[in-house]
């Protein structure tokens, strides 16, 4: 036994080198039944990607430009000289559509009407009746389809950058947030629930309440949360000088909204254009009423609205026209009332979240001292408390600063903010 043990120790000190059979055997360990086919597919993918890179010739760069060594300025200059500018026209009719000898009637503004054919680079399926096209100046052949003409002021209403307001920044509006999410988010995220029940999802919300209760703030939170296109319209923007301009802007606004996959249109201060119709004998409000009637028609008229959600905000719902408020146009009316004690406490905590405050400040006590206050009033209290700390050259805000601010804003400004007119706004 001792001799065998010594032999094992010698083998460990002088290990035998592996031959090719041993190496091949070790390579088979850990291989699954599909290892060979996976390797084959990986090799094919590698070869195909190499082939694609060879065909492209230029790798994508951050600037979108090729390397200077691959620039061909002479041919680019020649191409720019040969390429002629196109003229804008409108295709009014298609003769013999879906055939090889299809012809197109185009109307070139202030010149004439022509019957023309298609250019070499245009597909017949790209051209429809009524759309704008680009035609050359010699044969007037259609060279390119153009997007619909939309007023730049309407295009600028689209909110490109998402606001930094979230639902957590809206205090005292728990019930209102739930109602808003049911209308805006649920149909976009889970449309199958409405299909199973066989009902159409609500498409419009009217937010009404006293000034400063968070109507526009909640709309900004909706814009932050959703991935849909968000269009913000202020009511006074649609009141134009010339007859028909406001109605045209509304038409183009909804035309742009229908071209998006999903869209939310927010009308702020809608009482500027949505007032009840009446005859004042002068006719000064006729244009505003035409604009409102165009909105009424676009919301639920002859044509379907599509996947467009409409939010409206006002603090004077009693002045709005009944045709605008009927279900189908605005399905839900969400009231933003004055926040209760719990809501005011939450609003205090939201506004002091970024402030340097002392610990153990009794926000519930401060909320009790601000009865019948809106969220805007409480924000003003927090700002005024910070001003007291700056005056005293302190780096933190104390509870006494908040109490002084409450006395100044809530008690001192009472004649401005808590008038009976605002308390019984409706």
Curated annotation (Swiss-Prot):
Intracellular or extracellular location(s): Cytoplasm; Nucleus
Database matches in Gene3D superfamilies: 1.10.8.60, Nucleic acid-binding proteins (2.40.50.140), P-loop containing nucleotide triphosphate hydrolases (3.40.50.300)
GO molecular function: ATP binding; ATP hydrolysis activity; proteasome-activating activity
GO CC term (a single one): cytoplasm
Keyword Cytoplasm attached: yes
GO biological process: proteasome-mediated ubiquitin-dependent protein catabolic process
Extent of the signal sequence: none
Residues binding ATP, per UniProt: 209-216
Protein keywords: ATP-binding, Cytoplasm, Nucleotide-binding, Nucleus, Proteasome
Source taxon at top rank: Eukaryota
Role noted for this protein: The 26S proteasome is involved in the ATP-dependent degradation of ubiquitinated proteins. The regulatory (or ATPase) complex confers ATP dependency and substrate specificity to the 26S complex.
Similarity comment: Belongs to the AAA ATPase family.
Protein name, per record: 26S proteasome regulatory subunit 7
Gene symbol of the encoding locus: RPT1
